[in-house]
């Protein structure tokens, strides 16, 4: 049910269509020669949807939460700890060099240190393209465009994510009531006219 969170949260870096790394929250980053210290510079123009600025403290908080087992979002077992050097600089100390770190950071959504708690999943605050408007548990999530998003404006003002079984999802696409639907390879031959099949493996 948390499929919507990548739309709500921003990441340090992202990957483009060619899987090359591009900056998101980071404006610059680099690694020490021994591969044990990564330094990320963070944008200064990013706000969470509650109006609080996003800083390197939030980045360190998010990474340390995963490292310490408080969030099981990604495998950061190669990381020792993260720390905010100042408001716009975060250092990540590694246990050992690891070339998968950037790929992992490209999917780790940064959460607000000041507002993260047990009920965060129900009322997420992020800095991404969208913000939560409504969540009907087990049925749907309604998102609306974040007017303060720092990047290019989203192409859709509103997104409704319906939670349904694969057959129902395909039927919704076939009837024209869904713009996007997930299906497995077994049903790939049933893609309705006007839709494009994307391999997201």
Task: Annotate each language-model stretch with its function.
Residues 1-33, 64, 125:
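N-terminal lobe/hinge region of extracytoplasmic solute-binding protein
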Residues 13, 17, 47, 64-71, ...:
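Sec-exported extracytoplasmic/periplasmic mature domains
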Residues 16, 20, 97, 103-154, ...:
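Gly/Pro-rich hinge or "lid" segments in bacterial periplasmic/extracellular proteins
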Residues 17-18, 34-35, 43-45, 59, ...:
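Solvent-exposed coil/turn segments that connect beta secondary-structure elements
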Residues 28-70, 91, 172:
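Aromatic- and charge-enriched surface segment that lines or borders ligand/interaction sites
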Residues 34-37, 41, 74-115, 134:
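Surface-exposed binding/hinge segments that line
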Residues 76, 189-200:
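Ligand-binding "clamshell"
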Residues 118, 147-191:
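Ligand-site clamp/hinge motif
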């Amino acid at each position: 049910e948390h499929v919507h969170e990548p739309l709500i949260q921003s990441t340090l870096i992202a990957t483009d269509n060619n899987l090359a790394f591009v900056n998101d929250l980071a404006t610059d980053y680099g690694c020490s020669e021994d591969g044990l210290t990564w330094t990320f510079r963070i944008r200064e123009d990013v706000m969470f949807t509650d109006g609080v600025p996003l800083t390197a403290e939030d980045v360190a908080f998010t990474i340390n939460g995963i490292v310490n087992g408080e969030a099981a979002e990604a495998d950061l077992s190669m990381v020792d700890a993260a720390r905010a050097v100042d408001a716009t600089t975060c250092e990540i100390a590694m246990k050992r060099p690891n070339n998968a770190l950037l790929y992992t950071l490209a999917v780790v959504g940064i959460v607000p240190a000041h507002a993260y708690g047990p009920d965060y999943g129900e009322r997420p605050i992020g800095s991404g393209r969208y913000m939560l408007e409504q969540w009907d548990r087990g049925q749907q999530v309604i998102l609306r465009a974040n007017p303060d998003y720092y990047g290019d404006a989203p192409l859709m003002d509103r997104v409704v994510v319906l939670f349904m079984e694969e057959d129902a999802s395909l039927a919704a696409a076939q009837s024209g009531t869904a713009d996007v639907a997930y299906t497995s390879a077994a049903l790939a031959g049933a893609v309705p006219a006007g839709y494009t099949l994307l391999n997201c493996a």
